[in-house]
């Protein structure tokens, strides 16, 4: 059974504190937007899909109690709070897309004189709740389609060995996962022989989170340090690399956790197919190529300390961008809920992501 990183019922939201994993399992109450911003910014919840869901649900929780606000006041409050939530972590595109669509929904509901303030709030909150359901459904589709694409390139019924980086499972999404969802689907077919996961310095999402999920689900796996990828591919047959994405540009360039780019280079050298698994909400058609993606920089302390213990020499300068950008030329395929696309064919999914709502949340 997959881990439950988000617990939500109308008016109540709890998230699993990922900073405490794997040693402690503790849920944090999110009582509103301020709490939502903090848990996203502090990386107590992380992963582009999960950031979007938790941010929007924090607004739903804040709006749930009875109040006498007019439609106009609610609309203004919604826009301000959603824009504030987007600022918590700027690289992940999903929360920006969700915020834009919810603001559009609020504007539409506010302009309709036949809709009361009570119905406005009910429909708005209901639309956010629909996002939670859709995210899980989309992740399962990504898992199935990615599994199928990888097995097509494997001779006969040979067992499959894969490598993944960072964390892209139930802890990074509303449930099931993107790249780790593909791995779950491979495991369900009984074709998965082994998963290798990187520790993912400096925040150790692979060691703390991915390894935790793999052990929890009894998926055969091995943890390795980030600098071992070349040796792994040289000495052992790896059939595919599967990673997630925080933002994909229109040409297929992909921003993902720092270290992804160098893994893609090594995979190319060793003729290992490199796949990106991401929902359509992670594709940003407004950005023509990856150099336009804004890269978040994290505090030095995340590099110099583990917990309260300093591991780096005092006085050393640090450079700690959270993401790098993998060029589309290194990517074999981008796995979405609508299919697996070569990066130069992303324009064929434009109908799904342009002129149409990513989250399909407009319900008037």
UniProtKB/Swiss-Prot annotation:
EC number annotated for this UniProt entry: 5.3.1.23
Pathway(s) of this molecule: Amino-acid biosynthesis; L-methionine biosynthesis via salvage pathway; L-methionine from S-methyl-5-thio-alpha-D-ribose 1-phosphate: step 1/6
Keyword Nucleus on entry: yes
Entry's Gene Ontology molecular function annotations: S-methyl-5-thioribose-1-phosphate isomerase activity
InterPro entries, per the entry: IF-2B-related, IF-M1Pi, IF_2B-like_C, Initiation_fac_2B_a/b/d, M1Pi_N, NagB/RpiA_transferase-like
Marked site positions, Transition state stabilizer: 166
Reaction(s) catalysed by this chain's protein: 5-(methylsulfanyl)-alpha-D-ribose 1-phosphate = 5-(methylsulfanyl)-D-ribulose 1-phosphate
GO biological process, one term: L-methionine salvage from methylthioadenosine
One Pfam family this sequence matches: IF-2B
GO annotations of cellular component type: cytoplasm; nucleus
Main subcellular location of this protein, as a coarse class: cytoplasm
Function (record text): Catalyzes the interconversion of methylthioribose-1-phosphate (MTR-1-P) into methylthioribulose-1-phosphate (MTRu-1-P).
Name of the protein in its database record: Methylthioribose-1-phosphate isomerase
Organism classification: Eukaryota, Metazoa, Ecdysozoa, Arthropoda, Hexapoda
């Amino acid at each position: 059974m997959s881990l439950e990183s988000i617990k939500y019922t109308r008016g109540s939201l709890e998230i699993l504190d990922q900073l405490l994993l794997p040693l402690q399992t503790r849920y944090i109450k999110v009582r509103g937007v301020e709490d939502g911003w903090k848990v996203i910014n502090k990386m107590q919840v992380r992963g582009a899909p999960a950031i979007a869901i938790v941010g929007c649900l924090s607004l739903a929780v804040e709006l749930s109690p009875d109040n006498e606000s007019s439609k106009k006041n609610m609309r203004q409050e919604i826009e301000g709070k959603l824009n504030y939530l987007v600022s918590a972590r700027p690289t992940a595109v999903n929360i920006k897309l969700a915020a834009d669509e919810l603001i559009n929904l609020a504007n539409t509901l506010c302009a309709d004189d036949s809709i009361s303030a009570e119905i406005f709030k009910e429909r708005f909150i209901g639309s956010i709740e629909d996002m939670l359901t859709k995210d899980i459904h989309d992740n399962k589709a990504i898992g199935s389609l990615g599994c199928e694409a990888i097995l097509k390139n494997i001779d006969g019924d040979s067992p499959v060995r894969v490598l993944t980086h960072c964390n892209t499972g139930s802890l990074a999404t509303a449930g099931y996962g993107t790249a780790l969802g593909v791995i779950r689907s491979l495991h369900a077919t009984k074709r998965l022989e082994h998963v290798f996961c990187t520790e993912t310095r400096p925040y150790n999402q692979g060691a703390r989170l991915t390894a935790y999920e793999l052990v929890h689900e009894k998926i055969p796996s091995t943890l390795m340090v980030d600098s071992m990828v070349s040796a792994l591919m040289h000495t052992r047959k790896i059939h595919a690399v599967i990673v997630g994405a925080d933002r994909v540009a229109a040409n297929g360039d992909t921003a993902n956790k720092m270290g992804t780019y160098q893994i893609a280079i090594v995979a190319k050298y060793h003729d290992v197919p490199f796949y990106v698994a991401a929902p359509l909400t992670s594709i940003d058609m407004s950005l023509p190529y990856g150099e336009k993606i804004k890269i978040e920089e994290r505090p030095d302390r995340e590099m110099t300390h583990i917990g309260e213990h300093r591991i780096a020499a005092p006085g050393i300068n640090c450079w700690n961008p959270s993401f790098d950008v993998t060029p589309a030329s290194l990517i074999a395929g981008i796995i979405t809920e609508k299919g697996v696309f070569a990066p130069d064919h992303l324009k064929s999914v434009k109908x799904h992501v342009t002129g149409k709502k990513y989250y399909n949340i407009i319900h008037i």
